[in-house]
């Protein structure tokens, strides 16, 4: 079973979402099914079928979140050195072709936020950077094709969600 690294915030966010699905959304959809069922013939009852689809989606999401929580590995990136790229590292990279610099912070799968530069540890660019040090080059296949980057700096900055 593969562990999923995440911050304490990411773990708590998953737990809250799971609790909301179980205590609010699940009972709500069961009630919708009961109401639709009371309207009679289930074969041609669009409300009933829509509610059943919604129920299947909610149950799938509950199972997915439960699995993710069971595999969670809560990591405090402030507790270790960032001499190479790791979970929680804030990394400045330069595209060697365009010379454009970008800053990324490596976070858990459910914590990504491109506006803040937070990228999932499972993203192609994060996977390509892991273990690299300042001055190292790496290549990554992106939708626009293969790009080559250089790591300019690595540090730890507290995450702001």
From Swiss-Prot:
Classification via Pfam families: GreA_GreB (PF01272), GreA_GreB_N (PF03449)
Top-level taxon: Bacteria
A Gene Ontology biological process term: regulation of DNA-templated transcription elongation
PROSITE patterns in the cross-refs: GREAB_1 (PS00829), GREAB_2 (PS00830)
Alphabetically ordered keywords of this record: Coiled coil, DNA-binding, Transcription, Transcription regulation
InterPro entries xref list: GreA/GreB_C_sf, TF_GreA/GreB_CS, Tscrpt_elong_fac_GreA, Tscrpt_elong_fac_GreA/B, Tscrpt_elong_fac_GreA/B_C, Tscrpt_elong_fac_GreA/B_fam, Tscrpt_elong_fac_GreA/B_N, Tscrpt_elong_fac_GreA/B_N_sf
Signal peptide range in chain numbering: none
Keyword Transmembrane helix tagged: no
Keyword flag tRNA processing: no
GO function term, MF aspect, one: RNA polymerase binding
Coiled coil feature spans: 45-65
Residue intervals passing through the bilayer: none
Family: Belongs to the GreA/GreB family.
Function: Necessary for efficient RNA polymerase transcription elongation past template-encoded arresting sites. The arresting sites in DNA have the property of trapping a certain fraction of elongating RNA polymerases that pass through, resulting in locked ternary complexes. Cleavage of the nascent transcript by cleavage factors such as GreA or GreB allows the resumption of elongation from the new 3'terminus. GreA releases sequences of 2 to 3 nucleotides.
This protein's name: Transcription elongation factor GreA
Source organism per UniProt: Campylobacter lari (strain RM2100 / D67 / ATCC BAA-1060)
Underlying gene: greA
